[in-house]
């Protein structure tokens, strides 16, 4: 137990330093325009505490009017395209803690894989993210959405499945973190990925896919409206 606590505080120390010195994290300014857009929105009207915070990469960032899919919940989407799970560790205080969420929905890590980050590293970063939540936002429930397959990147599907399995097994007994499968709904009865669930790039989900995701996610959301 003491060893685990020491590791956590070491990670906090590293990321706090990174917040002070951008040069210590090589992706400190990655996709800065998207982040600045969110920060500008916040300056005009900062979201009130207690939202269900959706964060992650483009599969969530491109989910337009997310709240309309969940009319019985108050949702805040701060996902952005191209993000890695390590980016959310770096921007943790500003993109997560600052909003004082009542619940978090996370879908992130696939971009890390696509850029050469190992399966083990992605898994460790996701665990680190959840450990930080346990410290700064104790008791706040977290939904970890499964990495979804894309027809345009079939070679990556086995790696995505492996990460999904690691996450599912690791958090199966957690009272705070819930793994939710949004992968299975994208396959037809023949095991194929219908084009209707993807936009023209065959990478990102379509409106039809988001409707399916919403049906799966909604039962896991807290009542916060």
Predicted regions and their residues:
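N-terminal cationic-hydrophobic initiation segments that often serve targeting/anchoring roles
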Residues: 67, 96, 130-134, 168-172, ...
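A short helix->loop->beta-strand "cap" motif at the edges of active sites that frequently abuts
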Residues: 137-141
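Charged helix-capping and loop-helix junction motifs
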Residues: 120-129, 159-164
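Catalytic His-Asp segment of secreted/periplasmic serine-dependent ester chemistry enzymes
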Residues: 151-225
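N-terminal secretory targeting modules
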Residues: 1-53, 64, 68, 224
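Conserved beta-strand elements of the Class I
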Residues: 53-55, 76
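Extracellular/periplasmic catalytic domains that process cell-envelope and extracellular macromolecules
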Residues: 45-48, 69-70, 98, 136, ...
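Oxyanion-hole/transition-state-stabilizing segment in secreted/luminal serine hydrolases
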Residues: 60-69, 74-76, 85-123, 143, ...
């Amino acid at each position: 137990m003491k060893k685990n606590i020491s590791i956590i505080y070491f990670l906090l120390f590293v990321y706090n330093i990174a917040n002070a010195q951008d040069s210590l994290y090589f992706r400190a300014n990655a996709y800065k325009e998207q982040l600045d857009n969110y920060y500008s929105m916040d300056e005009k009207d900062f979201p009130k505490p207690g939202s269900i915070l959706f964060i992650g990469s483009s599969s969530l960032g491109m989910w337009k009017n997310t709240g309309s899919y969940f009319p019985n919940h108050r949702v805040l989407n701060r996902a952005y395209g191209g993000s890695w799970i390590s980016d959310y560790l770096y921007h943790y205080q500003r993109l997560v803690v600052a909003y004082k969420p009542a619940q978090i929905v996370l879908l992130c890590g696939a971009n890390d894989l696509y850029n050469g980050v190992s399966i083990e590293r992605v898994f460790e970063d996701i665990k680190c993210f959840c450990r930080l939540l346990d410290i700064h936002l104790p008791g706040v429930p977290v939904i970890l959405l499964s990495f979804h397959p894309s027809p345009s990147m079939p070679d990556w599907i086995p790696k995505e499945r492996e990460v999904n399995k690691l996450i599912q097994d690791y958090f199966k007994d957690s009272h705070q973190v819930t793994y939710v499968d949004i992968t299975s709904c994208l396959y037809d009865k023949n095991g194929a990925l219908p084009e209707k669930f993807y936009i023209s790039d065959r990478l990102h989900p379509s409106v039809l896919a988001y409707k399916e995701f919403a049906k799966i996610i909604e039962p896991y959301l807290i009542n916060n409206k």
